[in-house]
Every structure is written in C-alpha cells, then in structure tokens.
From Swiss-Prot:
Keyword terms of this UniProt record: ATP-binding, Chaperone, Cytoplasm, Nucleotide-binding, Stress response
Complexes and interactors: A double ring-shaped homohexamer of HslV is capped on each side by a ring-shaped HslU homohexamer. The assembly of the HslU/HslV complex is dependent on binding of ATP.
Residues that, per the record, bind ATP: I18, G60, V61, G62, K63, T64, E65, D259, E325, R397
Keyword flag Coiled coil: no
Similarity remark: Belongs to the ClpX chaperone family. HslU subfamily.
Taxonomic path: Bacteria, Pseudomonadati, Pseudomonadota, Betaproteobacteria, Burkholderiales
GO cellular component: HslUV protease complex
Family matches, as InterPro entries: AAA+_ATPase, ATP-dep_Clp_protease_ClpX, ATPase_AAA_core, Clp_ATPase_C, HslU, P-loop_NTPase
Official protein name in the record: ATP-dependent protease ATPase subunit HslU
Species of the source: Burkholderia ambifaria (strain MC40-6)
Function recorded in the entry: ATPase subunit of a proteasome-like degradation complex; this subunit has chaperone activity. The binding of ATP and its subsequent hydrolysis by HslU are essential for unfolding of protein substrates subsequently hydrolyzed by HslV. HslU recognizes the N-terminal part of its protein substrates and unfolds these before they are guided to HslV for hydrolysis.
NCBIfam families the record matches: hslU (TIGR00390), PRK05201.1 (NF003544)
Gene assigned in the entry: hslU
Principal location: cytoplasm
Length: 447
C-alpha cells in the first residue's frame, strides 16, 4: 500500500494532469485514508468504511486519467471498468460480481510478483548453481585422502571462476541443454457472457493436467538463467499463503474505478423497454458498494472496505437520476472543470509526457528535429478550443486530432528530411489547419 501523503500524491498527479485540483485532492485524501485506517486499533478499524467518490465532469477533462495514474501510485489492487459492460442478473452479459473476480486476479498476480521479488536473490544463486552443474559436472570421487581433497579444491576454484564470468555476462551467448518444468497446458473455453465463473472452474480443473513434466530445451545461458530463476523462485512460494495475502489485500486496500456510471441512469433508459434494464445494474451494484461477500475461486471476498470511485459526464442525466440508495453510497462529489485555452497549452507542453515531447521523440528516431515555438503551441491550443466550442466538446482528446492533422505531412515524409529541423510556429499552424478550423462543416468531419 502507498504511504505517500496527500500533498505528495497531488504533486505526482500534477506531473501528468493539468488542473482539476478538487478531484486530485479528493482521491489523494481517499488514498491516504486507506493507510490511516490501517494504523487504527482493531475494534474501531472494522467500523471505518471508505468514503466513495463520484467525479462529475465533461468528457476529456481528466477523470479516467486521474484513475489511471492513481492506480500506479496506489500500489494496491486496482481495476477500472465501464458500468455499461454489465447487465442485470438474468440477462445475457457480465454480472457485477465479476468486478471482484477481476480484482482478486489482479491482486494474486501482484502478490505473487511481490513474494517472488523477496526470494529472487536466493533463487538466482540456486539457478547459477544449476547452470554451473551443467557447465562443470562434478568429478567422480577417485582416490583417497589428499588427492580427493585437492581435486575438490580445484573444482571449487574453477566453479568460482565460472560463477564470476557468469555474473559478468561473459557466458551469455553460450548454449546449454537443460530440463525445465513444462507449464500446464492452457485450455481455451468458449463460453457465453455471464458464465465466466463456470468457465474458470473448468479451466482450473484441466490446468493441473501435465503439470510437473520436464521438457529438455537448448537455450542461451542468459535466457536459461532467467528461466531457472523464475522456476526456483516459484518453488519457494507457498501458493496458499499467496492466495490468503491476495484476498486480504483486496479486502483492505482494493480500489474499483466505475467509469460511465451516468450511462446506466433511469433517464437514459426512458422509452426503451426492449433494452436490458440499466436500472437493474444499479440495483446489482448496490450490495457490492454497500458491502457484501462474493464467492471467487480463491475463497470468499468481502467488499466492505473496497474503495469505489465512480465517474460520468452526466450530459443527459444528473447524479440525482441514480437510484437514491446508490447516491447515498457516494458521499464525496467532485465536479471537474471544462478545459480553457491555457489548460490546452499546458497539456501540450507542461506535463512530463506531453504530446509535444512524444512527437519530438517519435520523429527523432528518423533524425528529424521538431521544434515547437511558443506562439505555435498557443495557436494549436486556440484551434483545439475553438473546434470544441463549435462542434462536440471532447476535451483534451481534441488535441490528439489537431496535432495529428498538423504533423501529417511531416510524419509521412520524415524519411526525406533526415538531419533537418522543422519549426512549428503560428504561421505553420495556420497554414496547415487554418482553413479546416474556420470551416465548421470541414472541422466537424476532419478535426
């Protein structure tokens, strides 16, 4: 679990997301509260439930990006799902319990990787010993007394020399033959949506077939060392302990990001009696968010302390269109602001992995130097903002379309301009995009 303070979390989010201070503070406090709860004594700890968050704002302003970046910072089981993927129990489609099943799978993978990192040093030593046994087979014990001891000393000295060369990478390209445990044969089962649990049970039933068999392979020492290290580390793990820790990690630290929650409101479903009831999905989500127990192949998982962050644009609906019980389960509401020209400008140039830096790096691979003048970036931001105002407002995603159109010619003929420097200023932007941006009909289809 992350031990970062709210200020540190916001500072990390600021490197990738422009503006939206209120939303950043809300998720930072929620994440920190997970750590605070763990420091509270046991009788009271069980009573402290997470305060779920509802993020409201137009598309393309950073709701999903905040969740994506939070996942990397959280160091906790995290799953992002679209609410529109689920259907009411009884209809064909995924049911909401699969959210917890996805979360526990992610947690098992995380826990296994963490446990393997703990034993990797010891596993590497054992893998080196196995490779040295292949390169330097133990000599047969011939003779007695001093001769045998002398032979052992020589053999140990040789092994240490080879171990040093192995660690320095001098033997990487040499090939060796070794017996590796054959992975259990995976079984692909085609099943209709909503029957994932049954499919998993059948797959796990067949997964043990053929496990434990050895397969002789000829590989380079560099690859052999990695394969043997993984094999030795896996032997040191206790699978039951990994599963127990994974379940506990989900129950105490799990985070679920529910995107597009506005698309399952009752208002969006008016007059569409033939469609699957979206209000039914809300009713199915309710016990999950309130706290229930879900049966998974790793055991029973309680959802009482899982943090839920929901988001939606709420263009056609309002948060009050959600069923009252579900509204009450998202006590913290944060409104995200629409992006201004200055925000677009900062997104283009001020973030750690800005679009400008990405395109400069891409074209640098073909020895084309791309320079963006300040007035060029400003003009790009103005055009993106203007097109959003005239047509559909898709937020920062408009920048992808605009900059792709701007650099279309340069990207196409980059091979012919190796060693050259291309400067993108306001004049260049107007020449490439001016006509399209001003013509509303053209910009509707091109930008």
């Amino acid at each position: 679990m992350s031990t970062m303070t709210p200020a540190e979390i916001v500072s990390e989010l600021d490197k990738h997301i422009i503006g939206q201070a209120k939303a950043k503070k809300a998720v930072a406090v929620a994440l920190r509260n997970r750590w605070r709860r763990q420091q509270v004594g046991e009788p009271l700890r069980q009573e402290i439930t997470p305060k779920n968050i509802l993020m409201i704002g137009p598309t393309g302003v950073g709701k999903t990006e905040i969740a994506r970046r939070l996942a990397k910072l959280a160091d906790a089981p995290f799953v992002k799902i679209e609410a529109t993927k689920f259907t009411e129990v009884g209809y064909v489609g995924r049911d909401v319990d699969s959210i917890v099943r996805d979360l526990i799978e992610i947690s098992v993978k995380q826990t296994r990787e963490a446990e393997m990192r703990k034993v990797r040093s010891k596993a590497t030593d054992q893998a080196e010993d196995r490779i040295l046994d292949i390169l330097l087979p133990q000599p047969r014990a011939v003779g007695f007394g001093g001769n045998a001891d002398h032979a052992n000393d020589d053999n140990n000295a040789t092994r240490q020399t080879f171990r040093k060369r192995l660690r320095e990478g001098q033997l990487d390209d040499k090939e060796v033959e070794l017996d590796l445990e054959q992975p259990s044969a995976g079984m692909d089962i085609m099943a209709p949506p909503g029957m994932e649990e049954m499919t998993e049970q059948i797959r796990s039933m067949f997964s043990n077939l053929g496990s434990g068999k050895k397969q002789r392979r000829k590989v380079k020492i560099k690859e052999a060392l990695k394969l043997l290290t993984d094999e030795e580390a896996a032997k040191m793990l206790n699978d039951e302990e990994v599963k127990t820790k994974a379940v506990q990690n989900v129950e105490q630290n799990g985070i679920v990001f529910l995107d597009e929650i506005d698309k399952i409101t009752s208002r969006n479903n008016e007059g569409s009696g033939g469609e699957v009831s979206r209000q039914g999905v809300q009713r199915d989500l309710l016990p999950l968010v309130e706290g229930t127990t879900v049966n998974t192949k790793y055991g029973m998982v309680k959802t009482d302390h899982i943090l839920f962050i929901a988001s939606g644009a709420f263009h056609l609906a309002k948060p009050s269109d959600l069923i009252p019980e579900l509204q009450g389960r998202f006590p913290i509401r944060v409104e995200l602001d629409s992006l201004s020209v200055e925000d677009f400008e900062a997104i283009l140039d001020a973030t750690d992995a800005s679009l400008v830096k990405q395109y400069q790096a891409l074209l640098a691979t073909e020895d084309v130097q791309l320079e963006f003048a300040a007035d060029g970036i400003r003009r790009l931001a103005e055009i993106a903002y203007s097109v959003n105002e005239k047509t559909e407002n898709i937020g920062a995603r408009r920048l992808y379309t605009v900059i792709e159109k701007l650099l279309e010619e340069v990207s196409f003929s980059a091979g012919n301009h190796a060693g050259e420097c291309v400067t993108i200023d306001a004049t260049y932007v107007d020449r490439a995009l001016g006509e399209v941006a001003q013509d509303e009909d053209l910009s509707r289809y091109v930008l």
